[in-house]
């Protein structure tokens, strides 16, 4: 079985690292969260507590 030269391992490491970084950046910036739609659907009632000591 032929052995890989160290420069080939380094190139392979950089290719996989750059692929991982690009994939993570793509997932981070492509995720869109519609906060206006969910805030209209949720009817959260706020109960104000009036403490009388």
Swiss-Prot record:
Molecular function per GO: proton transmembrane transporter activity
Membrane-topology annotation of the record: Single-pass membrane protein
Subcellular localization(s) per the UniProt record: Mitochondrion membrane
Biological process according to GO: proton motive force-driven ATP synthesis
Main location: mitochondrion
UniProt KW keywords: CF(0), Hydrogen ion transport, Ion transport, Membrane, Mitochondrion, Transmembrane, Transmembrane helix, Transport
Annotated GO CC locations: mitochondrial membrane; proton-transporting ATP synthase complex
Top-level taxon in the UniProt lineage: Eukaryota
InterPro entries in alphabetical order: ATP8_metazoa
Transmembrane segments: 5-25
Subunit structure of this chain's protein: F-type ATPases have 2 components, CF(1) - the catalytic core - and CF(0) - the membrane proton channel.
Biological function: Mitochondrial membrane ATP synthase (F(1)F(O) ATP synthase or Complex V) produces ATP from ADP in the presence of a proton gradient across the membrane which is generated by electron transport complexes of the respiratory chain. F-type ATPases consist of two structural domains, F(1) - containing the extramembraneous catalytic core and F(0) - containing the membrane proton channel, linked together by a central stalk and a peripheral stalk. During catalysis, ATP synthesis in the catalytic domain of F(1) is coupled via a rotary mechanism of the central stalk subunits to proton translocation.
Family assignment from sequence similarity: Belongs to the ATPase protein 8 family.
The protein's name in its UniProt record: ATP synthase protein 8
Species this chain originates from: Aedes aegypti (Yellowfever mosquito)
């Amino acid at each position: 079985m032929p052995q890989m030269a160290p420069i080939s391992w380094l190139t392979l490491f950089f290719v996989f690292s750059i692929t991982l970084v690009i994939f993570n950046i793509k997932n981070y910036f492509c995720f869109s969260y519609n906060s206006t739609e969910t805030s209209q659907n949720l009817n959260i009632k706020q109960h104000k507590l009036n403490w009388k000591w």
